[in-house]
Amino acid sequence: FSTTAKTALVIDNTTGEVLLSKDIDRPIPPASMSKLMTLWMVFESLDEGKIELDDTLRVSRKAWGKGGSKMFLREGEYVTIKNLIKGVIIQSGNDACIVLAEGLAGTEENFAELMTIRAKEIGLRSSNFTNSTGWPDPEHKMSSKDLITLANKIREEYPSYYEIFDDLEFT
């Protein structure tokens, strides 16, 4: 295999065999793949009993007004954590990410700092987060190796939530 991509990592999840590896530790802008770390933080909070799927969070003006992909939440409405998770996974909702970030850490900025700290603790060495959505920022980066590591950790450590990733639509 070969690729013109700056960085790439393809692994056979059944055998663990590396099929393609190119500059896998190079930090790059991860865009919406950052949302995997947002979900990790939410899943961890759920498992620790800090929040529950049926808890509701209020949509802030910031979340409502965020551009890009969204769940189309309305400012001031309350949404369950379960529906916010679906909004992140199925609709790649920037608004849903921000509501979750604010609900867990007070502000998205605080949440991004916690994301970076936790990422290092779980072995993501090339990751730095400035927001919960992957919105472009020169300091917001992840490597291919970190992305695969995180995806595998979510699959292994939070199997009870993994079925949501199979859903194709959400209304």
Where do the language-model regions lie?
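Extracytoplasmic
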Residues: D146-T171
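Active-site-adjacent loops and short helices of periplasmic peptidoglycan-processing enzymes
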Residues: F1-K145, N152-E156
